[in-house]
Amino acid sequence: MQKKYITAIIGTTALSALASTHAQAATTHTVKSGESVWSISHKYGISIAKLKSLNGLTSNLIFPNQVLKVSGSSSRATSTNSGTVYTVKAGDSLSSIAAKYGTTYQKIMQLNGLNNYLIFPGQKLKVSGKATSSSRAKASGSSGRTATYTVKYGDSLSAIASKYGTTYQKIMQLNGLTNFFIYPGQKLKVPGGSSSSSSSNNTRSNGGYYSPTFNHQNLYTWGQCTWHVFNRRAEIGKGISTYWWNANNWDNASAADGYTIDYRPTVGSIAQTDAGYYGHVAFVERVNSDGSILVSEMNWSAAPGNMTYRTIPAYQVRNYKFIH
């Protein structure tokens, strides 16, 4: 009996050592549904702080299919033969990363095969070129020819920038703009000579909707759902009005401003509900194949100022209106 017991101990120890060796050999881990930074750090025998440091995480928020480093040195932007790779930090957006590297958010989406605007801390993104220094930015700003573009209904700064192969920040600089507001008939300076012929689709949103574009200052209360959605729309070049007041008034106010309101979610649209005392709005980051949607929001499941993500099941999507 004692001999069998010793054999069992040896066998168990060997299996544990094998599992430990396998875990230590791994350098990355793909997050599965239900996992947390605690469970992953425990699996690989590292601390939560180490795991977050390796991946540039500033919170415990992780996503299914996110690839995390579990060994090696802390992540940084690196240059490879195929271009520069940037590690997303908390608070980054495609627009802010594009501005940093002197490219467009559309180009970054194309380089990385993205079909929506959702990015997360620790994610690796290919970017075109290298980070622009201040001296280089000044040099590029003082040279080159410009042309004049007449704004059409449904245009946005991002759409025009994409049409002319530039950035919306460059167009704002050329025209002395301090916000995203443009209007039909307005004349804008744009870099280069003529635009490409394929321009009609760029004036529409993902769902084919025409949307007015405002360039207001964000006057919504800091950290509220309305404040967050205003900023997310501005980031994708589809600025909204700062005068729609509480979330339960956004459907009527946006309709009065000419926006399309329906029950069909699209990436970049605003999910709106009158439920609760003030109502609620969220930004649609992704529309899933099963009819559910992923939204980003504030002041829903966390304190004001803390952005969270939530998947709204398909059967609940019908409870929301969508502002395009």
Curated annotation (Swiss-Prot):
InterPro entries: CHAP_dom (IPR007921), LysM_dom (IPR018392), LysM_dom_sf (IPR036779), Papain-like_cys_pep_sf (IPR038765). The gene is sle1. Residues 27-70, 84-127, 147-190 form the LysM domain. This is N-acetylmuramoyl-L-alanine amidase sle1. PANTHER family: LYSM DOMAIN-CONTAINING GPI-ANCHORED PROTEIN 2, MEMBRANE-BOUND LYTIC MUREIN TRANSGLYCOSYLASE D. It is found in: Secreted; Cell surface. Keywords: Antimicrobial, Bacteriolytic enzyme, Cell cycle, Cell division, Cell wall biogenesis/degradation, Hydrolase, Repeat, Secreted, Septation, Signal, Virulence. Its main location: secreted. GO terms for molecular function: lytic endotransglycosylase activity; N-acetylmuramoyl-L-alanine amidase activity. Peptidoglycan hydrolase involved in the splitting of the septum during cell division. GO terms for cellular component: cell surface; extracellular region. Its EC number is 3.5.1.28. Residues 200-324 form the Peptidase C51 domain. Residues 1-25 form the signal peptide. Pfam families: CHAP, LysM. GO terms for biological process: cell wall organization; defense response to bacterium; division septum assembly; killing of cells of another organism. It catalyses: Hydrolyzes the link between N-acetylmuramoyl residues and L-amino acid residues in certain cell-wall glycopeptides.
